[in-house]
Amino acid sequence: MNINVADLLNGNYILLLFVVLALGLCLGKLRLGSVQLGNSIGVLVVSLLLGQQHFSINTDALNLGFMLFIFCVGVEAGPNFFSIFFRDGKNYLMLALVMVGSALLIALGLGKLFGWDIGLTAGMLAGSMTSTPVLVGAGDTLRHSGIASTQLSSALDNLSLGYALTYLIGLVSLIVGARYLPKLQHQDLQTSAQQIARERGLDTDANRKVYLPVIRAYRVGPELVAWTDGKNLRELGIYRQTGCYIERIRRNGILANPDGDAVLQMGDEIALVGYPDAHARLDPSFRNGKEVFDRDLLDMRIVTEEIVVKNHNAVGRRLAQLKLTDHGCFLNRVIRSQIEMPIDDNVVLNKGDVLQVSGDARRVKTIADRIGFISIHSQVTDLLAFCAFFIIGLMIGMITFQFSNFSFGIGNAAGLLFAGIMLGFLRANHPTFGYIPQGALNMVKEFGLMVFMAGVGLSAGSGISNGLGAVGGQMLIAGLVVSLVPVVICFLFGAYVLRMNRALLFGAMMGARTCAPAMEIISDTARSNIPALGYAGTYAIANVLLTLAGTLIVIIWPGLG
């Protein structure tokens, strides 16, 4: 039996879509030196090649893909979005605005200089910034702009063409810039990271190992009684001196949970909870021949939970003010916008931050109730909330503003982005509402993006040969300029206007570009994870601003003549 593959694919949109996705994802795993192509560019290249062979796909699939993607971007940004406006993130907000705003203005200028249409210009901006949200925002605004169908088709084809031609240029140039730009300034990143570490008492090690606390029991002997010198536990400050916390005492056969007024006596058996290295550093008066193995004394349930910061008595306060160790709990990680941050006593907590805390189950529960709630370890998505806010986003996108003879609509991209932000924000405040497991959110976001990329590539593929010959050289120049010049402007603004620490500044710059590979290079150069503080500060707001930039470039373009 002979099978005509071309007819088979043309007659089955679903089969064609998944063939494009599979081939594109395989291509995306290839590396050019140290740079991996990535899923987005892999799917786009395959779809452009198949589009040249006149394969096509239903545009409804393209629309659904971009809607799912942009909605999930909003959900991820929601927990930290408003805190960047209203709290200590003003510097990060300004950096993100400078990065995105300068790129937008430069792209508009180059588009007019080279005589491109809005499709090529917006696509070049999206590719140079390696930002799919720009592409999504511009495409949606074009579809609702009311231009003639032939012009719209050409603009959408050029949009994906510009993106495809400049994406790798933007990615590679930023990675090279991240490697060499720190060497062109007077302060090296390692020194800057160490300076922040000294000021804030941080661990600068980018590969810090996280251990769980363990419990061991010791019998109080004459040396330990002499060491305490009759002081109670509060006066001794056992944790400050040893790094361990006395969780239980057995005295005269009776188990008790000690308070700060307890005084250790000869023959007491004490259960100490602490990290392994803290036990190893204990004074010999604790350890030498004094360890005991008492099933009841050691029978404690040490748990590790992820606590989401929510309550007003924790939001806006510094990490040190929580005094976790005073409550017998140990902090392992601080996570913001899915970025692990250095454990810094001076970090101001935002709503939606996640603290990974270990300790006795009852104590961890008490701490969680005080500062927020324990993250739900569920694999079930609240589909009702997901669908309801998706509908709200579509309805917001239908709103149109009229100014004399000029009108513009909010569009699906901005509407869904806003609805997603609200769902993420409400989820951070109400633990039982709108829960979406991170794995499920990542899957929907990635799948939506890949479907969108497949659609735009198949639509634009037929004209790529002509377009490449006409504007290829111009695209190379424009891509480099739009990728690197805003980074330099952002550096000068952060270094000499905001006077930011260089390690934090370079992390924030990579966050404003939403480029994780470049962030890894900055962390390696600094030999520290301290730049992650800056990356997390700009990442959430940059995703939103980039989507709006895609909308704005289409709205502004006709007014430039």
UniProtKB/Swiss-Prot annotation:
GO molecular function annotations of the record: monoatomic cation transmembrane transporter activity
Sequence intervals crossing the membrane: 8-28, 32-52, 66-86, 94-114, 158-178, 383-403, 406-426, 447-467, 475-495, 540-560
Keyword Coiled coil part of the UniProt annotation: no
Annotated Gene Ontology cellular component terms: plasma membrane
Domain RCK C-terminal stretches: 200-288, 292-373
Top-rank lineage group of the source organism: Bacteria
Keyword Thylakoid appears in the UniProt entry: no
UniProt xrefs under Pfam families: Asp-Al_Ex, TrkA_C
Membrane topology annotation: Multi-pass membrane protein
An individual GO BP term: potassium ion transport
Alphabetized InterPro entries for the sequence: AAE_transporter (IPR050144), RCK_C (IPR006037), RCK_C_sf (IPR036721), Transp_YbjL_put (IPR023017), YidE_YbjL (IPR006512)
Keywords, alphabetical: Cell membrane, Membrane, Repeat, Transmembrane, Transmembrane helix, Transport
Localization of this protein: Cell membrane
Major place of residence: membrane
UniProt xrefs under HAMAP family: YbjL (MF_01015)
Family: Belongs to the AAE transporter (TC 2.A.81) family. YbjL subfamily.
Name of this chain's protein: Putative transport protein YbjL
Lineage, opening ranks: Bacteria, Pseudomonadati, Pseudomonadota, Gammaproteobacteria, Enterobacterales
Gene: ybjL
